[in-house]
């Protein structure tokens, strides 16, 4: 009965969050916005970023599923609560499937926030889509490799009623960092960055940023409340996701491209009262 009540409350919260997201999206669509073409694609840039994301994510997948570089033997004596930092101990919880489900839902909503860019001209959809694909690929690759290299049991493993299936599939020691939080913050940062660059004069940019990051923060909170992650797992996931979510769009702006443009060489000559001056810029 207690689990059922938790599930009902979690489902109600999920519905409210969804309604809130739809409401701010509806208001956004009804407001005429002045659009700036802030981003563009470049063959070299896309080759590097898509290639990096594909290599990171692909190699991590191969090493995890086929090479088995991470050992998953569980020994209770290796994992003692007293060895955990005090800050992480404060947020430790046993496993909760209802909260796990809700956390996955908030992550999905945060990742779906770039859908608001449907208000932009259709000619920009490819640019936005490619940038977002690069964001998710790179964030996923960094997250997956960190999980492979860092051995950390999830908080629920320190409680007696830990889920047996998690132990069997090897997911129990992949706590660091939080993948859900990484994706949620990547989506939130990407949406915020792109919206603020494309609609700098819009009053909705604060609402977009608040709703997007609010959903990401809730994702991290639910990942801790469900017993899946420690506070530091969520914190690092938020940093990774935010960094990639801001960096990838920035590397498609005119300011970024301008740093690599060759300035034209110029020469000038002038006659002055004191002599003859020649200048050469390169």
Predicted regions and their residues:
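Hydrophobic alpha-helical transmembrane segments of multi-pass membrane proteins
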Residues: 98-102, 129, 133, 178
């Amino acid at each position: 009965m207690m689990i059922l009540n938790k599930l009902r409350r979690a489902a109600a919260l999920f519905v409210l969050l969804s309604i809130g997201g739809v409401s701010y999206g509806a208001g956004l669509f009804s407001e005429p916005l002045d659009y700036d073409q802030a981003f563009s694609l470049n063959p070299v840039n896309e080759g590097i970023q898509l290639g990096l994301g594909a290599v990171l994510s692909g190699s991590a997948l191969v090493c995890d599923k086929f090479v088995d570089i991470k050992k998953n033997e569980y020994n209770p004596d290796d994992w003692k609560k007293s060895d955990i930092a005090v800050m992480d101990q404060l947020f430790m919880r046993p496993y909760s499937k209802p909260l796990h489900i809700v956390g996955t839902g908030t992550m999905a909503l945060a990742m779906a926030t770039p859908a608001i860019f449907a208000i932009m001209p259709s000619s920009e959809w490819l640019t936005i889509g490619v940038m977002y694909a690069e964001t998710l690929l790179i964030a996923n690759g960094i997250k997956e490799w960190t999980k492979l290299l860092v051995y950390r049991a999830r908080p629920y493993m320190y409680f007696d009623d830990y889920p047996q299936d998690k132990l069997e599939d090897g997911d129990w020691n992949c706590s660091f960092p939080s993948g859900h939080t990484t994706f949620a913050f990547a989506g939130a940062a990407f949406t915020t960055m792109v919206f603020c660059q494309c609609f700098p004069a819009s009053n909705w940019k604060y609402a977009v940023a608040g709703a997007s990051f609010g959903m990401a923060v809730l994702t991290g909170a639910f990942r801790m409340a469900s017993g899946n992650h420690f506070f530091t797992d969520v914190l690092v996931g938020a940093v990774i996701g935010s960094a990639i979510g801001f960096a990838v769009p920035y590397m498609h702006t005119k300011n970024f491209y301008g740093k690599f443009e060759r300035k034209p060489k110029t020469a000038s000559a002038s006659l002055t009262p004191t002599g003859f001056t020649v200048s050469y810029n390169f």
